[in-house]
Amino acid sequence: MAMTMHVDIVSAEREIFSGTVNMLFAPAEMGEVGIMPRHTPLITRLKPGEVRLQRPEGQEDFFYVSGGLLEVQPHVVTVLADTAQRAADIDEAAALAAKQRAEEALQDREGKLDYARAQAELAEAIAQLKAIQRIRKKLG
């Protein structure tokens, strides 16, 4: 029998996922991390991006997180996200509109612009769109 671990993905609003997985991939600050059962304990910050879960049945689940923390214990992994949602639930039109607004804000040299905020909004929209693209590719 393959080794598994319990994963909880929780946002400020609600629990998004709770179940058994073989492996988790997450967008840590220093790059993507892959977590398997019995991984050494770890706490790291997450940047906006996709969390991917490989389930024992062979199924993969995709989630978008806007940032947060990843806590790893030998048999339990917790993703504490600022906001999180299943990739299938992301509104693609809204993500495209947010990307467009952020790109326009970054090009507006005369307006009062908070570059850090505009860049964060752009990164978030791009991460959402990537999550949508990956799930579409996976589903064929």
Swiss-Prot record:
Q: What is the lineage of its organism?
A: Bacteria, Pseudomonadati, Pseudomonadota, Gammaproteobacteria, Chromatiales
Q: Write out the function statement from the record.
A: Produces ATP from ADP in the presence of a proton gradient across the membrane.
Drop me one GO molecular function for this one.
Answer: ATP binding
Tree of life domain: Bacteria
Name the record gives this protein: ATP synthase epsilon chain
The UniProt keywords, alphabetically, are: ATP synthesis, Cell inner membrane, Cell membrane, CF(1), Hydrogen ion transport, Ion transport, Membrane, Transport
Family to which this protein belongs: Belongs to the ATPase epsilon chain family.
Keyword Lyase carried by entry: no
